[in-house]
C-alpha cells in the first residue's frame, strides 16, 4: 500500500502562533516603556516565524484526513523481528528495546477521528531514512501500546 503524508499545521500550532501574534500586538499597542514595545515586537516576530515553519500535523494526500505521527527508534538487530511484527501483530513489538540504537525507525501515523493507523519501518542509510517495509493499515485499537 502506498500512502503519502504531508506536513500541515495542527490546531496546537495555530493556537501557539496566533496567541503570540495577539500578545505581541497588544504589547506593541499599549502605551508603555520601550522595553515592553521591544518585547511585543519580538513576540510578533516569533509568531510570524512560527506561522511559517511550525507544522506538526500530517495529512493524508488521498483522503485529506489529519494524522499524528509517532516515531520509535530501534537497533539494527531488531530489524527482522519488527518487520515480522508489523506485518501481522504490531502489539507484539518489544518496546523495552527502544532507544538502544537508531538504525531502524518505526513511523506510526494515527488518527483518533478516523480510527485508523498506518505503520512503516524505515532503515537508516547515510543522512536519511529509507523505507524497508510496506505501509500497513491497522485499527487504532490494535496499536494502542505503540502510540503511548
Feature names for model-found ranges:
Residues 115-148:
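A membrane-cytosol interface segment of integral membrane proteins
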Residues 19-27:
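Hydrophobic, membrane-inserted alpha-helices
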Residues 16, 31-46:
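Hydrophobic alpha-helical transmembrane segments
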Residues 43-62:
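Transmembrane alpha-helices and immediately adjacent membrane-cytoplasm interface residues
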Residues 58-105:
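Cytosolic juxtamembrane segments of membrane proteins
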